[in-house]
């Protein structure tokens, strides 16, 4: 997708935010609003942090400049025995037995990420021939090092980061400069949200709806939300945590936005459900709707691009915003 500056992207997000699509259905617990289309709150929480922390924008601009320099110099990899290990801490906050998902369901999410971020998922074979040469692999290995659990009376946490603080009924992050912290809880209308690199340590990490965490294909006896039961919501949000933007550039269909990646096609807007290929927008040869950074159902997203892989790896390079992860 054509490049624009991070400044322009943030300015556009200030006017568009992150789309939500929800409706109530009686077939699932009352406290989980039926999510008929994927939604994330990453841009919404970014806007709030930009308003609360005037220095964040300059830090993000510096990170973007570093990312471009690092990719251009082909110095994106910080490999140890061929991989970069990402220690993962899962902070599970639950009110009901249903929300208190099992260790096996949690491990299934780690297994999904280790496949998906390395193009080792079986469904990557479904990528259209137009994009097969663009399939990206990162060399990342996610390692579950700790599960923290806490019971709560809170019905739904929302996006105000309260779940990230013990004093507010949540769980404090575990050594965030060195670990990927994930908070799993009831988020109501949202599947999840995440922060881009540059945010303050105390709130850095990924937040996921408990029933969108893990994979039914790996562990069938878990608590899952239909259409979002293969672990791809976490792929999407961890992509944000590694500095990826939505593939359509959050431009509301104008074809003027960008995800700041060269090998993803210009795309007019987000895709939902399981669109038939090609879905053409912005005079492209077909949207890369199967990309994890789109909004399709879990079963219909199964790739990152090579350019996205480079962008993610850049955050771990020496001097990068996540260079201390795993160190």
Region roles according to the model:
Residues 90-94, 212, 297:
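Short, histidine-centered active-site or binding-site loop motifs used for metal coordination
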Residues 24-176, 321:
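Propeptide-to-catalytic entry region of secreted or membrane-anchored zinc metalloproteases
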Residues 23-26, 264-327:
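Metalloprotease/metallohydrolase-associated module, dominated by Zn2+-dependent proteases
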Residues 14-17:
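C-terminal motif of bacterial Sec signal peptides marking the signal peptidase cleavage site
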Residues 97-100, 224-229, 296-303:
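Active-site rim elements
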Residues 111-273:
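Metzincin-family zinc-dependent endopeptidase catalytic domain
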Residues 2-9:
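Sec-dependent signal peptide recognition
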Residues 102-109, 230-234, 305-311:
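Stable alpha-helical elements in mature extracytoplasmic
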């Amino acid at each position: 997708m054509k490049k624009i500056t991070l400044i322009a992207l943030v300015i556009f997000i200030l006017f568009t935010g992150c789309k939500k699509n929800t409706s109530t259905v009686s077939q699932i617990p009352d406290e989980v609003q039926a999510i008929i289309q994927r939604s994330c709150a990453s841009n919404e929480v970014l806007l709030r942090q930009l308003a609360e922390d005037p220095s964040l924008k300059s830090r993000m601009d510096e990170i973007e400049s570093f990312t471009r320099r690092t990719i251009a110099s082909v110095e994106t990899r910080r490999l140890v025995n061929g991989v970069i290990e990402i220690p993962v801490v899962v902070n599970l906050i639950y009110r009901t037995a249903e929300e208190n998902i099992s260790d096996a369901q949690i491990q299934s999410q780690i297994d999904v990420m280790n496949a998906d971020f390395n193009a080792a998922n079986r469904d990557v074979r479904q990528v259209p021939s137009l994009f097969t040469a663009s399939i990206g692999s990162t060399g990342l290995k996610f390692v579950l090092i700790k599960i923290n659990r806490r019971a709560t009376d809170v019905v739904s946490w929302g996006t105000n980061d309260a779940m990230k603080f013990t004093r507010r009924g949540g769980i404090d992050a575990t050594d965030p400069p060195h670990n990927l912290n994930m908070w799993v809880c009831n988020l109501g209308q949202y599947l999840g949200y995440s922060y881009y690199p540059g945010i303050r340590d105390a709130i850095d990490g990924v937040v996921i709806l408990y029933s969108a965490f893990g994979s039914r294909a790996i562990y069938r006896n878990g608590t899952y939300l239909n259409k979002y039961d293969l672990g791809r919501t976490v792929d999407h949000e961890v992509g944000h945590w590694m500095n990826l933007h939505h593939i359509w550039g959050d431009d509301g269909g104008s074809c003027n936005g960008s995800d700041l990646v060269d090998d993803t096609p210009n795309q007019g807007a987000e895709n939902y459900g399981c669109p038939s290929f090609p879905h053409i927008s912005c005079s492209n040869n077909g949207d890369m709707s199967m990309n994890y950074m789109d909004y399709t159902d879990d079963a219909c997203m199964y790739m990152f691009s090579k350019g996205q892989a480079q962008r993610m790896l850049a955050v771990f390079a020496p001097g990068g915003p996540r260079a201390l992860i795993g160190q």
